């Protein structure tokens, strides 16, 4: 087995027990240096440098800094001598002062007027008492597969949404991937954000109609398993998200032959985009890395690595898709970012969905669709006009000022996207979305999965006034709790609305 070295554009995460050790390099730095240079040097040791403008001043002060001090173990500095303590505190205070000085005040945020709800979709049915963690639509057999955290099982529904099959997993199914005649299922031991070896990859035979069989066990929060063939040999890519100990693995004929140790691998695609007969593996990575990686298979078994996109740690990548989004015959990369799990903060203007031109060397951004807190999206032709549209759900939406962004339809007209709330956007805290011809009438419908998984105040979240200013309104949470988590089915009515 080969353990890959880190791509040059990435830096390995530091596995250090406390802030004093993490900042120990400060003591060996000769002379004084500017606060900006100090911040760039030290913050870039673990991840890409986050510019001060990436968050408002109050978010740095009340959100990011308490979180980082807890993460780095600032309390442990008391175990060191007075000189070390003074030096480390002075440098840390200098870094914080730089960010507070260079970041902007939070402007007032008036509540936005909600745009008209999309007439292209209407509520068809609801499947109650489901903590939805994954959705897969089997178009050939008219079945919908749902990963349910509540029952820790894969539930299968027919077109009338009758539960026709249940695969007990005793784990939380989080991803489905159909490859040839197998429906692969990635499962976690729980939704708790902890490193664990309770994860599993298995598959359901006969394209999801047969029996469940485990394939790989003892995994650290697996998020995607993609099998493929190359030069007559069976390969597979496994993404283990983990928390601090995740990894990306390549299997050949069932044996692990290559490992890249990095946490946060969240999605994967295998394509031959340049039609040279050599497959390329694209992996989206979140956590502190926030990047898009490409592994190119070479004749003779070699693998070339490259970093196509690298963002700062507050970016929050959540999902990806690769297809020809604008009909120009070339594959585009669609990426969403909106995860703010680590600490609560105000909306970030760079959250949303971006379309990148894969044909350019620098992966140029072609379009940006703003959507705060976006967690998942699906691409579909909602109006049957030949233009590919996008539907998205935002788990971390701005529920105080723009609650309609929780579930949106982004309609493409003349190359631009117009945003419309989906019917029932306020009915749940949507975590997953999928599209497909659910009712068999020839046009794509939508499936929305709710998962109200509340995060309560953590030890480092101590400023009650700040927390009140960014928390989800109690009335919104009360509505979610009253309705319960569920699967919502939206029927395509675009033909009727014309």
Task: Map each language-model feature to its residues.
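Bacterial Sec-dependent signal peptides at the C-terminal "C-region" and cleavage site
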Residues: 23-33
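Beta-propeller-forming repeat regions
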Residues: 41-498
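Sequence/structural segment immediately N-terminal to covalent heme-attachment motifs in c-type
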Residues: 31-45
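Bacterial N-terminal signal peptides that target proteins for export
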Residues: 4-17
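Small-residue packing motifs within transmembrane alpha-helices
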Residues: 20-21, 60
């Amino acid at each position: 087995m080969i353990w890959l070295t880190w791509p040059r554009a990435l830096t390995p995460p530091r596995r250090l027990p406390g802030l004093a050790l993490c900042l120990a390099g400060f003591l060996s730095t000769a002379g004084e240096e500017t606060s900006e240079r100090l911040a760039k040097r030290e913050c870039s040791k673990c991840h890409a440098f986050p510019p001060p403008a990436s968050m408002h001043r109050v978010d740095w002060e009340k959100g990011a800094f308490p979180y980082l001090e807890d993460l780095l173990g600032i309390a442990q500095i008391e175990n060191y001598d007075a000189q070390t303590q003074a030096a480390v505190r002075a440098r840390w205070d200098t870094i914080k002062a730089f960010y507070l000085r260079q970041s902007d005040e939070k402007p007032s945020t008036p509540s936005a007027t909600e745009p008209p709800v999309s007439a292209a979709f209407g509520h068809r049915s609801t499947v109650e008492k489901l903590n939805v963690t994954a959705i897969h639509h089997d178009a050939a057999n008219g079945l919908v597969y749902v990963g349910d955290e509540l029952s820790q099982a894969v539930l299968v529904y027919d077109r009338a949404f009758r539960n026709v099959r249940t695969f007990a997993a005793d784990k939380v199914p989080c991803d489905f991937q159909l490859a040839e005649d197998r429906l692969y299922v990635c499962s976690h031991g729980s939704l708790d954000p902890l490193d664990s070896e309770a994860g599993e990859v298995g598959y359901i035979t006969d394209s999801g109609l047969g029996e469940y069989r485990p394939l790989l066990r003892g995994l650290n929060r697996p998020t995607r398993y993609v099998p493929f063939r190359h030069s007559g040999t069976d390969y597979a890519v496994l993404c283990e998200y983990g928390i601090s100990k995740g990894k990306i693995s390549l299997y050949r004929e069932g044996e692990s032959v290559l490992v890249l140790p990095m946490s946060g691998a969240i999605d994967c695609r295998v394509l031959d985009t340049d039609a040279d007969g050599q497959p390329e593996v694209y992996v989206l990575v979140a956590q502190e890395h926030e990047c898009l990686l490409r592994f190119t298979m070479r004749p003779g078994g070699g693998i070339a690595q490259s970093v196509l996109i690298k963002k700062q740690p507050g970016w929050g990548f959540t999902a990806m898709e690769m297809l020809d989004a604008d009909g120009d015959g070339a594959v585009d990369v669609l990426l969403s970012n909106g995860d703010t799990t680590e600490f609560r903060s105000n909306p970030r203007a760079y959250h949303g969905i971006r379309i990148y031109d894969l044909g350019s060397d620098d992966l140029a951004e072609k379009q940006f669709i703003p959507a705060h807190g976006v967690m998942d999206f699906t691409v579909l032709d909602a109006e049957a006009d030949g233009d590919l549209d996008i539907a998205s759900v935002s788990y971390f939406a701005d529920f105080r000022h723009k609650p309609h962004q929780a579930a949106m339809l982004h309609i493409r007209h003349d190359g631009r996207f117009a945003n419309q709330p989906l019917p029932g956007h306020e009915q749940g805290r949507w975590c997953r979305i999928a599209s497909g011809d659910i009712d068999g009438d020839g046009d794509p419908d939508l499936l929305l999965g709710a998962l109200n998984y509340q995060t309560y105040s953590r030890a480092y979240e101590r400023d009650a006034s700040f927390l009140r200013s960014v928390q989800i309104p109690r009335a919104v949470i009360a509505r979610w709790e009253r309705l319960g988590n569920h699967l919502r089915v939206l029927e395509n009515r675009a033909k009727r609305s014309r």
